[in-house]
């Protein structure tokens, strides 16, 4: 009887050791995933910090009341807002359009969806959007994360770093890139987007995106249906 109990104890010890090793292995895999993800997020912040735009503006002297031109430089996240709402845009090669627009927002309100590419500003953010797509894709395709909910948790970390004007640019940019658009709709990446920042005639309606792009609960329902 004693020998039988000893064998049973040994068997239980082996089971416990195996479970502990599996737990340690799972923890190491998750830590490796997170380390890579946070490296990617740090690079994303570096790309934002590297954004720079120089423009000229008129300033009136307090003493002489005369106007003079000065050059100013904006950097980082400020560039997103400036390009969207303030950058002067005109189309000298278009004989039917002599208007100077104030930001991409006005171009979108004039030309609709086609105005995004017509403005010729989006290439400034090419590296930014390509890397953001890599981050979302890395999470979505991760074998270390089990199911939509686990992946959504990390997508939430990414989304939490997006400013209001980054979300606006993401909304318009992704209309032209189906793969990015699909990830946005899958994980409600635009749930914090404020519709009042969108150009006129654009909204959170299904004409542009599936409801899941803005509604995490709906995105969860769709994901669970797919996982069944």
Spans of features found by a protein language model:
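Intrinsically disordered, low-complexity polar regions and short flexible loop motifs
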Residues: 19-228
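Transmembrane signal-anchor/signal-peptide helices with a preference for the extracytoplasmic
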Residues: 1-17
């Amino acid at each position: 009887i004693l020998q039988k109990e000893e064998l049973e104890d040994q068997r239980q010890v082996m089971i416990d050791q195996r479970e502990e090793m599996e737990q340690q292995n799972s923890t190491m895999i998750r830590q490796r995933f997170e380390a890579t993800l946070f490296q990617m997020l740090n690079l994303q912040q570096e790309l934002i910090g590297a954004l720079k735009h120089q423009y000229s503006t008129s300033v009136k002297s307090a003493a002489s009341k005369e106007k003079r031109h000065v050059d100013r430089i904006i950097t980082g996240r400020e560039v997103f807002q400036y390009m969207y709402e303030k950058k002067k845009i005109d189309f000298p090669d278009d004989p039917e359009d002599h208007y100077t627009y104030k930001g991409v927002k006005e171009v979108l309100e004039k030309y609709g969806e086609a105005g995004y590419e017509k403005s010729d500003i989006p290439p400034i953010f090419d590296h930014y959007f390509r890397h953001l797509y890599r981050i979302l894709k890395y999470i979505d395709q991760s074998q270390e994360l089990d199911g939509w909910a686990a992946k959504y948790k990390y997508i939430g970390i990414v989304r939490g770093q997006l400013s209001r004007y980054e979300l606006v640019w993401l909304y318009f940019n992704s209309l032209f890139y189906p793969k990015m658009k699909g990830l946005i709709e899958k994980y409600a990446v635009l749930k914090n987007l404020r519709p009042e920042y969108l150009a006129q005639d654009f909204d959170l309606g299904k004409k542009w995106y599936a409801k899941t792009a803005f509604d995490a609960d709906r995105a969860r329902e769709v994901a669970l249906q797919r996982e069944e």
